[in-house]
Amino acid sequence: MQARALLPATLAILATLAVLALAREPPAAPCPARCDVSRCPSPRCPGGYVPDLCNCCLVCAASEGEPCGRPLDSPCGDSLECVRGVCRCRWTHTVCGTDGHTYADVCALQAASRRALQVSGTPVRQLQKGACPSGLHQLTSPRYKFNFIADVVEKIAPAVVHIELFLRHPLFGRNVPLSSGSGFIMSEAGLIVTNAHVVSSSSTASGRQQLKVQLQNGDAYEATIQDIDKKSDIATIVIHPKKKLPVLLLGHSADLRPGEFVVAIGSPFALQNTVTTGIVSTAQRDGKELGLRDSDMDYIQTDAIINYGNSGGPLVNLDGEVIGINTLKVAAGISFAIPSDRITRFLSEFQNKHVKDWKKRFIGIRMRTITPSLVEELKAANPDFPAVSSGIYVQEVVPNSPSQRGGIQDGDIIVKVNGRPLADSSELQEAVLNESSLLLEVRRGNDDLLFSIIPEVVM
């Protein structure tokens, strides 16, 4: 009986305490009908920012260990979640930061990164899951910040191959080495680009020639020549791998600037994956300046060392894109590469040749892509040279060619073909190959002229 009498009194006390607890927590203010961001506070938040309850202003997020879940509590910050009324990190494993320190979890690293941003402007990023290895250097040191060449090599090396050309002696059955060089993989199925002189020989000895390709991982394959252009010194060969291969992508050599860093990689003296670095001396060195009388190509000149065996290997920019094929060394510090835009043209021409009755066309000009450095050079020689930012500079018109007969002159600037603006020479070359007639818009001095040119078919 006595217990029953005490029960109503106990319930009354509990109800009173609940009311007092609710009274201590101020009621949430109603959200305004219109959000006025000018009235939002500008707090400094070590835990980051989150939208407020009305989704109007940014307020400080609750940090790890702070209460959450109640009507007036701020949402938990980035990578945190509300667990039993307290903000906890979603991940519990330790991580290694780029500052060389081990953090208890991802959230602790992110908090340190926000503090570092406020102090030095350099964030701390996650390097790996788990503790930092012993003896790890500060990853913000110059060795780690400026080792960009190592990053490029790590990216491109698996797609660079060593190529050897042998002659199978008909009597003794021995392989007689004829040449060796490098190449790079262009397709996962085994298409490789190299120099024509690496995979062909002028040897008059009798016997069957064989091509052997060795990958970075040591796998070796017999290769066959798919397409070859000895004048341009470009060739493609094919292997049949057992699995997909790493590949390199072609960059845009017309965008190269003098002074730009480049990396050359190849197999000089059969020493695979030998790396040299340098800068672009000029992106358009006329082949005739190198004593190549029949050349219609502008080469990339670099001081990256290219030796015997480097031929056919890639010259890449710091993005790991192929911007040339290592081809020729004149002297120490003076080497040359075939531009990637010419490789693209070669691949396109031979693809067309395989899919249709293909005929080569030409209009008879030697040309250079307009670049700021070229305009500066031409203005120095001729102050009246027009101020142009893009187009094709006609360096020379071949006598009795379609261009000469159509009225094109040395020094003209071709700005459009069939109404399309020209950004580089490859676009004009593509139009010559694929279109039966060309309407060229030309800038000559201060005059804009139109010329109709019919490309000539070369059998």
Curated annotation (Swiss-Prot):
Residues 365-450 form the PDZ domain. It is found in: Secreted. Its EC number is 3.4.21.-. Its main location: secreted. Keywords: Disulfide bond, Hydrolase, Protease, Secreted, Serine protease, Signal. One of its GO terms (molecular function) is serine-type endopeptidase activity. GO terms for biological process: negative regulation of BMP signaling pathway; negative regulation of transforming growth factor beta receptor signaling pathway; proteolysis. The keyword Disulfide bond applies. Disulfide bonds join 31-54, 35-56, 40-57, 45-60, 68-82, 76-87, 89-107, 96-132. Induction: Up-regulated during early pregnancy coinciding with placentation. Also up-regulated in joint cartilage affected by arthritis. InterPro entries: Growth_fac_rcpt_cys_sf, IGFBP-like, Kazal_dom, Kazal_dom_sf, PDZ, PDZ_sf, Peptidase_S1_PA, Peptidase_S1C. Residues 181-347 are annotated as: Serine protease. One of its GO terms (cellular component) is extracellular region. The active site is at residues 197, 233, 311. Residues 27-90 form the IGFBP N-terminal domain. It is an enzyme of class 3 (hydrolase). Serine protease that cleaves beta-casein/CSN2 as well as several extracellular matrix (ECM) proteoglycans such as decorin/DCN, biglycan/BGN and fibronectin/FN1. Inhibits signaling mediated by TGF-beta family proteins possibly indirectly by degradation of these ECM proteoglycans. May act as a tumor suppressor. Negatively regulates, in vitro, trophoblast invasion during placental development and may be involved in the development of the placenta in vivo. May also have a role in ovarian development, granulosa cell differentiation and luteinization. Homotrimer. Interacts with MYH9. Interacts with TGFB1; the interaction inhibits TGFB-mediated signaling. Interacts with BMP4; the interaction inhibits BMP4-mediated signaling. Interacts with TGFB2 and GDF5. Belongs to the peptidase S1C family. This is Serine protease HTRA3. It comes from Mus musculus (Mouse).
